[in-house]
C-alpha cells in the first residue's frame, strides 16, 4: 500500500515515522544503483543497474514483472582505465572506509536526448579517483543495439578534489548539465555540449558535507514546479552483512532545492547544500535499511516516483541481496515526501 503525509518544512527534516512501504516489485528485483526510463514507442520500462557490465531489465510497469535482458556493454568499455572490464561483484563487496569500495563499472544514468537513449556509466577502481564517466547510446534499448562512445571528458585523478563517478544528466530547457561525484569534495556539476555527449566547460561544486568522510554521492537533479530538487545519497552504502555502520550512518536519501539548476541549493531549514545542508527524504524504517542509489521518474500514471535500492532486513544485508524499491513522491508541501 502506498500512502503520503504532509508536514511543514521545519518538521520535515525530523520526520522519521510514517514512511510508506516500497511499492511492489516482481521478477528480477535484486539490484544496485538503479536507473529507470520508459521507451517512447511502446511504453515499456527499462531499468539499468551497477554490475555485469551494466545489467538491464525490462517490464510492462514499474511493478514488473522485471525480465533481465543482459549486459548493456558485454564487451566492456573503451575507456582505458582500471575497471573497464567490470570486475565488480556485489555479493562480495565490503565497506573499507573508502568510497564505492569494489564498485568498478557502475552507477548508470538513463536519459533520452533528441530521440536517442543515452546511458551514462562510470569506470573506476577500488577506492580510486582514477575515474571517468562514459556514454553508450541506442535508438531502441534492445539487446545488442548499444554503441559505446567512451569518455564524456569528465574524468578525475588524484590531483582533483572530486571523483568522476555517479553521473546524472539534467536537461534545463535544452541546456545540458552533468551532475557527478562521490566523497572527496562531493557533488559537482559540469555544462555539457548541445548533444549531451561531451563536457563543454569546467565543473563547479554544488553540494558538500564538510563533516566526517564527506559521505555524499549519487546525486540526481529533478525539476518540479518552480524548484530544482537535488537528491543525493548520504552515508555508508555497502557491506552491511560484514560491518554494520553505527545507527544513522547507513545510506539515506536527502534533498536540497533551488530556483536555479546550477547552484544555491538549500535544505528545508535554509542551510546551504554546500555547507552540510540536506533534508531527509527517506531513511531506514521498518524492514527497509539503507535506502539510496536513487533517481526520480515521472510515471504517466503515478506522477513523480522516487526509486532506489535497499536492504530488506527480513531477507539479508548482503550487497547482492539489495532490492529495487520505489515510492510515489508528494510535493504538496514544497518538499518531496514519501
From Swiss-Prot:
The record marks 166 as: Important for catalytic activity, responsible for pKa modulation of the active site Glu and correct orientation of both the proton donor and substrate. It comes from the Eukaryota. The keyword Metal-binding does not apply. Its EC number is 3.2.1.99. The active site is at 33 (proton acceptor), 217 (proton donor). GO terms for molecular function: arabinan endo-1,5-alpha-L-arabinosidase activity. GO terms for cellular component: extracellular region. Keywords: Carbohydrate metabolism, Glycosidase, Hydrolase, Polysaccharide degradation, Secreted, Signal, Xylan degradation. Coiled coil: none annotated. The keyword Secreted applies. It catalyses: Endohydrolysis of (1->5)-alpha-arabinofuranosidic linkages in (1->5)-arabinans. Gene3D superfamilies: Glycosyl hydrolase domain, family 43. It is found in: Secreted. Pathway: Glycan metabolism; L-arabinan degradation. One of its GO terms (biological process) is xylan catabolic process. Residues 1-20 form the signal peptide. PANTHER family: ARABINAN ENDO-1,5-ALPHA-L-ARABINOSIDASE, ARABINAN ENDO-1,5-ALPHA-L-ARABINOSIDASE A-RELATED. Endo-1,5-alpha-L-arabinanase involved in degradation of pectin. Its preferred substrate is linear 1,5-alpha-L-arabinan. Belongs to the glycosyl hydrolase 43 family. This is Probable arabinan endo-1,5-alpha-L-arabinosidase A. It comes from Aspergillus terreus (strain NIH 2624 / FGSC A1156). The lineage of its organism: Eukaryota, Fungi, Dikarya, Ascomycota, Pezizomycotina. The gene is abnA.
